[in-house]
C-alpha cells in the first residue's frame, strides 16, 4: 500500500499494523511485512506499507447488506407483523439464546452469530492495542483535563459547523428527514450541553490507541471470521489528533453507526421490492439494530473484561457509548447534507434515539 497523503510523521496505519503484528502477535489483521520510511530532519515519514494478503470474500459492509436484505425479504416471506415484533431497549445486552424466537424466526441465527464473532475480534483488537506497558505510544492512560479541553473544542467546533450546514440545507429535505432536522435544531442547546457535560473526574476507565475509523468497510470477511484493517484514522482529523488515546468504545460506536447505516442503506436501495410503508421498514430496522447492538455489547463487554481492558462499569460504558455515537452521528450529518440529502435521515434518526426526542 502506497500512501497518497504523506505526513511529516509516522503513519498510524504503519505504526499500529507493526505494533499489532510484532509486539502483540494479534492474528486478526493482515500481518505487517515491511515498510518504506524516510528520515527527514529528525522526522520519520511513512511512504508505503506491506502486509500479508488475507484471502477474503469482500468486506463486512457488502456482507451485511446481503444478509440484511434477506432479513427484510423475510418480512414478506414469513408474513411478519412488524408492530408485534418484541422490542429490545437500545444498549441492553442480550445473549443469543435469550433472543425471542419471533426475532430468530424473522432475522435468522447466522446474523447474530456473525455479530458475536465481530464483537469478539473487536475486543481482542482493543485488548492488544491496550496491552503494552513499555511503549509510551501505546500504554493505556487515564482521562485528564487536557484531553477534555481537546475533546470539547473539537466537538463544539464540529457541532457548530453542522448546525450551519443543516440551516443552509433544510430546503433539500422532506418528510421524516425534515421533521427530524427541525427537532435537531429545536434541541441544539441540549445537544451542545451533552457534549459539554464530559466530566473526566467521574471516569474510571482508560484511554488507549484505537482504530479511529472503525466501520464495516474496514473489516474483511474470511469464511465465518473477520480481519480488521486500515488503521489510518479519521480522514478529517490531523495526524496528531489521530494518535490521541481515546476510549475504545469510540470504535464500538463507529461500528454501531455502520450497522445502522447498513440497515437503512438496505431499505433505501430496495424499498420498491418490500411491500411495506417506509415508516414500517424503519421501525423493523430499528428493532433489528437494537438486537444486533445488544448481542455485540454482551460479547464485547465480557471479552474486554476477561482481557483486563478497563472500559469502566455499566453506567460509564453507557455514558461513553452514547457520547461517542452522538459525536459520530453529528459528524455523519454534515457529510450526508452535502453529498446525499436523502440519506440525512440516517444520522438524524441516530441523534434522535440518543437524545430521546
Residue map of PLM features:
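Conserved ATP-binding subdomain of kinase catalytic cores across diverse folds
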Residues: 1-168, 216, 222-314
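Hydrophobic core residues within well-ordered beta-strands of beta-rich domains
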Residues: 47, 208-210
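An alpha-helical support segment within catalytic cores of ATP-dependent transferases
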Residues: 162-208
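Active-site micro-motifs of SAM-dependent methyltransferase domains
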Residues: 193, 221, 257, 261, ...
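Active-site-adjacent structural elements in folded domains
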Residues: 195-202, 311-319
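Conserved catalytic-loop position in the HRD/HxD motif
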Residues: 213
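ATP/Mg2+ or Mg2+-diphosphate-binding catalytic cores
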Residues: 283-309, 319-357
Amino acid at each position: 500500500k502506497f500512501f497518497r497523503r504523506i505526513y511529516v510523521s509516522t503513519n498510524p496505519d504503519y505504526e499500529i499494523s507493526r505494533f499489532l503484528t510484532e509486539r502483540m502477535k494479534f492474528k486478526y489483521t493482515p500481518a505487517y511485512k515491511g515498510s518504506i520510511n524516510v528520515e527527514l530532519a529528525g522526522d520519520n515519514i511513512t511512504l508505503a506499507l506491506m502486509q500479508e494478503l488475507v484471502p477474503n470474500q469482500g468486506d463486512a459492509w457488502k456482507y451485511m447488506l446481503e444478509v440484511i436484505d434477506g432479513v427484510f425479504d423475510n418480512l414478506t416471506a414469513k408474513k411478519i407483523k412488524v408492530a408485534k415484533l418484541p422490542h429490545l431497549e437500545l444498549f441492553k445486552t442480550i445473549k443469543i439464546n435469550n433472543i425471542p424466537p419471533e426475532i430468530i424466526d424473522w432475522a435468522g441465527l447466522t446474523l447474530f452469530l456473525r455479530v458475536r464473532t465481530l464483537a469478539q475480534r473487536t475486543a481482542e483488537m482493543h485488548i492488544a492495542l491496550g496491552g503494552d506497558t513499555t511503549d509510551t505510544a501505546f500504554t493505556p492512560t487515564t482521562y485528564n483535563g487536557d484531553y477534555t479541553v481537546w475533546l470539547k473544542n473539537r466537538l463544539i467546533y464540529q457541532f457548530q459547523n453542522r448546525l450551519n450546514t443543516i440551516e443552509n440545507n433544510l430546503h433539500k429535505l422532506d418528510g421524516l428527514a425534515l421533521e427530524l432536522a427541525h427537532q435537531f435544531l429545536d434541541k441544539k442547546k441540549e445537544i451542545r450541553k451533552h457534549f459539554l457535560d464530559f466530566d473526566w473526574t467521574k471516569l474510571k476507565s482508560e484511554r488507549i490507541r484505537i482504530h479511529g475509523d472503525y466501520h464495516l468497510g474496514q473489516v474483511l470477511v474470511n469464511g465465518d471470521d473477520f480481519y480488521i484493517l486500515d488503521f489510518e484514522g479519521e480522514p478529517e482529523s490531523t495526524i496528531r489528533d489521530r494518535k490521541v488515546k481515546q476510549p475504545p468504545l469510540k470504535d464500538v460506536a463507529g461500528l454501531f453507526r455502520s450497522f445502522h447505516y447498513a440497515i437503512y442503506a438496505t431499505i433505501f436501495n430496495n424499498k420498491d421490492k418490500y411491500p411495506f410503508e417506509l415508516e414500517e421498514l424503519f421501525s423493523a430496522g430499528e428493532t433489528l439494530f437494537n438486537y444486533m447492538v445488544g448481542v455485540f455489547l454482551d460479547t464485547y463487554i465480557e471479552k474486554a473484561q476477561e482481557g483486563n481492558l478497563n472500559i469502566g462499569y455499566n453506567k460509564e460504558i453507557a455514558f461513553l457509548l452514547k457520547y461517542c455515537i452522538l459525536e459520530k452521528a453529528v459528524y455523519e450529518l454534515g457529510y450526508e447534507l452535502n453529498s446525499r440529502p436523502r440519506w440525512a435521515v440516517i444520522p438524524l434518526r441516530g441523534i434522535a434515539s440518543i437524545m430521546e426526542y
